Swiss-Prot record:
Distribution of this protein across tissues and organs: Plasma. Associated with HDL.
Protein name: Serum paraoxonase/arylesterase 1
Keyword annotations of the record: Antioxidant, Calcium, Disulfide bond, Glycoprotein, HDL, Hydrolase, Metal-binding, Secreted, Signal
Modified how: Glycosylated. The signal sequence is not cleaved.
Upper classification of the organism: Eukaryota, Metazoa, Chordata, Craniata, Vertebrata
Family indicated by similarity: Belongs to the paraoxonase family.
Organism this protein belongs to: Oryctolagus cuniculus (Rabbit)
Length: 359
């Protein structure tokens, strides 16, 4: 009887292991290879070598870029150097990056580790930049005021909250108001690792304001990018390891109601929204295994999706760019401005391309 019990337990354990292995391979898309999709004129951005994880382009063509992210389990080519915020003027013929100086007596530059970013412009045209920061592997949101003439950021405030335990990305909806994705439920790195590998789908989205903080969506397998429609009525959330983008209706009281989901054959990361057309531009990881288990001989590929008419019954999804990692490794974000596209990566370079007429 004891042997039968042991054999049964062994069989259940092996079945569980096989099921978990199969689930892991599916979630990380380990067998995916990309079919190249080229654009007519692409150039690597000089001065970006250690990541450009998120970016946002203002209506006037100024682009903010978060650079130098150190994320647990992800490659970093310069792990001891603090991160920074870069600026590009996309109106220039050959735009270059400029590091924005950061002022503010209480801000610690030495531990700056920027992740997702978002901007908010008020009625007086003051631009506020919100930056997800991971000082010493913690999660904060840093609020800055952009000083265009000085080419600097004035640090205004550091935001911490128990419902912001593992922030990945944010979308600003006011000067101190935002939605934030938490890519994990746990804070401890060991528990985070188990959470991700077991596919617990415990990550969630938080609404934050100075007087009201609450969970507004949950049950995600690594909630990642988040953005909002130009009219402010819909919120888009990328679920990285489920390969989905969710559309939520936003209500006047800031609650979110699920509307629809789109499935993809790629790991969807950050979402940019064209303010004119409403199209979504999504930085993606075709094969997640190569991001989380880096091999320089077999680097992670890059892929950019364009989603048109996402609210319709049949949204149009186009691969705008795809490359096997020879040029650009680990794309996380893409945004467009006047026929040009800027693509960022989690730990590698950035690419600036002309869009073809088909796009």
């Amino acid at each position: 009887m004891a042997k039968l019990t042991a054999l049964t337990l062994l069989g259940l354990g092996l079945a569980l292991f096989d099921g978990q292995k199969s689930s892991f391979q599916t979630r990380f898309n380990v067998h995916r290879e990309v079919t190249p999709v080229e654009l007519p004129n692409c150039n690597l951005v000089k001065g970006i070598d250690n990541g450009s994880e998120d970016l946002e382009i203002l209506p006037n063509g100024l682009a903010f870029i978060s650079a130098g992210l150190k994320y647990p389990g992800i490659m970093s080519f310069d792990p001891d150097k603090p991160g920074k915020i870069l600026l590009m003027d996309l109106n220039e013929k050959d735009p270059v990056v400029l590091e924005l100086s950061i002022t503010g007596s209480t801000f610690d530059l030495s531990s700056f580790n920027p992740h997702g970013i978002s901007t908010f412009t008020d009625e007086d045209n003051i631009v506020y930049l919100m930056v997800v920061n991971h000082p010493d592997s913690k999660s904060t949101v840093e609020l800055f005021k952009f000083q265009e003439k000085e080419k600097s950021l004035l640090h205004l405030k550091t935001i911490r909250h128990k419902l912001l335990p593992s922030v990945n990305d944010i979308v600003a909806v006011g000067p101190e108001h935002f939605y934030a994705t938490n890519d994990h439920y746990f804070i401890d790195p060991y528990l985070k690792s188990w959470e991700m590998h077991l596919g617990l789908a415990w990550s969630f989205v938080t609404y934050y304001s100075p007087n009201d903080v609450r969970v507004v969506a949950e049950g995600f397998d690594f909630a990642n990018g988040i953005n909002i429609s130009p009219d402010g009525k819909y919120v888009y959330i990328a679920e990285l390891l489920a390969h989905k983008i969710h559309v939520y209706e936003k209500h006047a009281n800031w609650t979110l109601t699920p509307l629809k989901s789109l499935d993809f054959n790629t790991l969807v990361d950050n979402i940019s929204v064209d303010p004119v057309t409403g199209d979504l531009w999504v930085g993606c990881h075709p094969n997640g295994m190569r991001i989380f288990y880096y091999d320089p001989k077999n680097p992670p590929a890059s892929e950019v999706l364009r989603i048109q008419d996402i609210l319709s019954k049949e949204p149009k999804v186009t691969v705008a760019y795809a490359e096997n990692g020879t040029v650009l490794q680990g794309s996380t974000v893409a945004a467009v401005y006047k026929g040009k596209m800027l693509v960022g990566t989690v730990f590698h370079k950035a690419l600036y391309c002309e869009l073809s007429q088909a796009n």
